[in-house]
């Protein structure tokens, strides 16, 4: 399953602050894709965030709605008032955090967590508990926290690679150990070392049943798992076909527009170059069968394949575009190819047409 956190983790991207209307617009698009959970935000952050969450909660969405909360009763009160079904309570339990950030003992921290979970449960909320910085927290501290969570009937527990530097094999081992406690497991993987997707996959292999993701991989610092990538991995490698792959490009563009954060052209799945072919050998093969250079055809993602024209072009590239103009002339293919190869500039469609007209006159 997928928990999309574009509206919570994604809003922790520098420069990103959604209006209530933008928050709703993104939530509706995520629901159309079919994500299982939408983390709608942290309602205690500001009035604007709270209003946006309430607006989403007023809709009849299929996704489960979860709001973020510190292990504080006043935070949980905001979640209760926001009318969502789930609360995500987090607290860091590493010795370093307990000593330097919170100045409390492990027993005191567990007592605080216990009160927060019990309060949420008493108010009818389902609870996901995250021992923040799970991957760097001492096992004895984790073990005691997870056993407490199980005793309090927490609904899900999240294994968080908060600083994004964990090796995938180590992450797999940790997730398996947590799964053995019998509580359904989420994984929340940051991308600081470029390992978020790999760790998410290893989390799945270790028994996790929910992966946290964001549109365009938004989030603190280097972000977290990209929604389009993990949904496609589930489709391609695990046969999970319940998500709308044909809507991924659309929501990526929408979130880029709202946030003002553009993607690299070579970004997987939703980048502008993801289904663009340039080298003549590649183009020749793709025109025969896209599977030669596309693991899944562009059409699966509601996208169009692009053939790029510059000096790397071959005859098939030129022939392809000439046929679009109704021209079937092998000698002219050679003439135009020679012209293209002599240029250091790419040939846009308009420039291609202009050159055809010039050479034909």
UniProtKB/Swiss-Prot annotation:
Question: Which pathway does UniProt place it in?
Answer: Amino-acid biosynthesis; L-lysine biosynthesis via AAA pathway; L-alpha-aminoadipate from 2-oxoglutarate: step 1/5
Q: Which Gene3D superfamilies match?
A: 1.10.238.260, Aldolase class I
Q: Where is the signal peptide?
A: none
The name on file for this protein is Homocitrate synthase
- Reported cofactor(s): Mg(2+); Mn(2+)
- GO molecular function annotations of the record: homocitrate synthase activity; metal ion binding
Which InterPro entries does this UniProt record tie to the protein?
Answer: AIPM/Hcit_synth_CS (IPR002034), Aldolase_TIM (IPR013785), Homocitrate_synth (IPR011872), LeuA/HCS_post-cat (IPR054691), PYR_CT (IPR000891)
Sequence positions that bind 2-oxoglutarate: 8, 68, 128, 162
Which GO terms of type biological process are on file? lysine biosynthetic process via aminoadipic acid
Q: Residue limits of the Pyruvate carboxyltransferase domain?
A: 1-249
- EC number, as in UniProt: 2.3.3.14
Broad enzyme group: transferase
Active site (UniProt): 282
Positions with a binding annotation for Mg(2+): 9, 188, 190
State the family named in the UniProt similarity comment for this chain. Belongs to the alpha-IPM synthase/homocitrate synthase family. Homocitrate synthase LYS20/LYS21 subfamily.
Reactions catalysed, as given in the entry:
acetyl-CoA + 2-oxoglutarate + H2O = (2R)-homocitrate + CoA + H(+)
Record keyword Transmembrane present: no
Q: Which UniProt keywords apply?
A: Amino-acid biosynthesis, Lysine biosynthesis, Magnesium, Manganese, Metal-binding, Transferase
The source's domain of life comes to Archaea
- Return the Pfam families for the record: HCS_D2, HMGL-like
């Amino acid at each position: 399953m997928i928990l999309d956190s574009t509206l919570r983790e994604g809003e922790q991207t520098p420069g990103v602050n959604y209006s209530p209307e933008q928050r709703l617009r993104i939530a509706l698009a995520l629901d159309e894709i079919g994500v299982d959970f939408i983390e709608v935000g942290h309602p205690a952050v500001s009035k604007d965030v709270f209003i946006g969450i309430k607006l989403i909660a007023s809709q009849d969405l299929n996704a489960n709605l979860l709001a973020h909360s510190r292990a504080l009763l006043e935070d949980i009160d905001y979640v209760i008032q926001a009318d969502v079904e789930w609360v995500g309570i987090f607290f860091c339990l590493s010795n370093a955090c307990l000593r330097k950030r919170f100045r409390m003992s492990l027993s005191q921290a567990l007592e605080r967590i216990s009160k927060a979970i019990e309060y949420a449960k008493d108010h009818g909320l389902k609870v996901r508990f995250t021992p923040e910085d799970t991957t760097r927290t001492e096992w004895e501290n984790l073990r005691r926290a997870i056993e407490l969570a199980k005793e309090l009937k927490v609904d899900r527990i999240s294994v968080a690679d908060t600083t994004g530097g964990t090796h995938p094999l180590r992450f797999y081992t940790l997730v398996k150990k947590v799964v053995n406690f019998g509580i359904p497991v989420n994984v929340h993987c940051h991308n600081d070392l470029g390992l978020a997707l790999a760790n998410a996959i290893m989390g799945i292999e270790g028994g996790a049943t929910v992966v946290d993701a964001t549109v365009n991989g938004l989030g603190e610092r280097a972000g977290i798992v990209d929604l389009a990538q993990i949904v496609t991995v589930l489709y391609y490698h695990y046969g999970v076909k319940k998500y709308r792959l044909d809507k991924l490009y659309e929501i990526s563009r929408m979130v880029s527009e709202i946030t003002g954060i553009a993607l690299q052209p070579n970004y997987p799945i939703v980048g502008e170059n993801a289904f663009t072919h340039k080298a003549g050998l590649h183009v020749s093969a793709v025109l025969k069968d896209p599977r030669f250079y596309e693991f899944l055809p562009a059409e699966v993602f509601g996208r169009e394949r692009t053939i790029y024209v510059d000096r790397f072009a071959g005859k098939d590239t030129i022939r392809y575009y000439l046929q679009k103009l109704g021209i079937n002339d092998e000698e002219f293919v050679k003439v135009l190819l020679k012209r293209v190869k002599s240029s250091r500039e790419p040939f846009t469609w308009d420039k291609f047409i202009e050159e055809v007209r010039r050479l034909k006159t």
